[in-house]
Amino acid sequence: MKKYIALTLLITTVCFAQKTAVYCIGDSTMADKKDPERNPEHGWAQVLQPFFNDNIVIINKAVNGRSTKSFINEKRWDSVYNKLKKGDYVFIEFGHNDEKIEDSTRYTNPHTAYRHNLIRFVKESREKGAIPILLTSIARRNFNEKGVLVPTHGDYPLETRLAAQEYSVPLIDLEYHTELLEQSYGPEKSKQLHLHFKAGENAYYDKDKADDTHLSKKGAVEVAGIVVKQLKILQDKSLEKLKKSMK
């Protein structure tokens, strides 16, 4: 009996070791949410696993409210780095909270600290033999009175693109593709992608809710679908394992 148990544990360990981990680091637009059956808010990495078969394991380490600075200072990056193994992937999407100039624990200058933090994630992932993928911040639903979607992220997406170019990192330009998504829905229907409820309309909220940054489950699934579609399009041999494991 003991031999049987030991053999079972060995097989389980070997099977898990053969799986490829995808670590997701970022902010609330990516993060898992509590009580997902009731909570309308979802991060896009929270709904990413169903797009892949069992050879890929999504490990979502994104946390609400984090910037590159606070993610590092709270040792969250260290906890990911210490677990990385050769062939793993690291999806990196920050920016929303790096913009918080009124908060010294989170704010980063896009051209200096933000850029250097992204480069740190890239270099240290590669040190462990893992494959980093940079993603620009998802767009906010920010239509003006003329129905024009107005950008809100300043130079953060630009610095992400430049870092990806300089260090030959696969890039998914989520800002651009989610702009197209918002525009395809239009000023009114795009509310479905986010959190818009009247008081009493949803049991999770007892007051009116109008949140144009965070995603509904519908919005999260749309964004996760964009990520997968763009991974398929990218011409990079390091992504073949991901592509072969897509459903």
Which positions does each model-derived feature cover?
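A broad, structure-centric signal for solvent-exposed, well-ordered loop/edge residues
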Residues: 8, 32, 55, 68-70, ...
